[in-house]
Swiss-Prot record:
Keyword rRNA-binding carried by entry: yes
The protein's assembly and partners: Part of the 50S ribosomal subunit.
GO CC, one annotated term: ribonucleoprotein complex
Gene that encodes it: rpl23-A
Gene3D superfamilies tied to this protein: 3.30.70.330
Protein name: Large ribosomal subunit protein uL23cz/uL23cy
Pfam families: Ribosomal_L23 (PF00276)
Higher taxonomy: Eukaryota, Viridiplantae, Streptophyta, Embryophyta, Tracheophyta
Source organism per UniProt: Nicotiana tabacum (Common tobacco)
Protein's UniProt keywords contain ATP-binding: no
Amino acid sequence: MDGIKYAVFTDKSIRLLGKNQYTSNVESGSTRTEIKHWVELFFGVKVIAMNSHRLPGKSRRMGPIMGHTMHYRRMIITLQPGYSIPPLRKKRT
């Protein structure tokens, strides 16, 4: 589970769940083929498409020093109809 950091739950990602598309943040150095192979192997699903984009880091100030957070990559994984990925984290009660 080195490639995928965590699942993303935003308004857009929740809307994409209806189209059988799952969104997650992955390691910046990971390639599409690595992530596709890992998802198919770990979850036992068939991936038909993957879209990715790199999100920029944000500026952070600590007193007089200006810094920034690291950039990261987000993948939108489309599965074949009939397949699904269970939630990666259960809801707290």
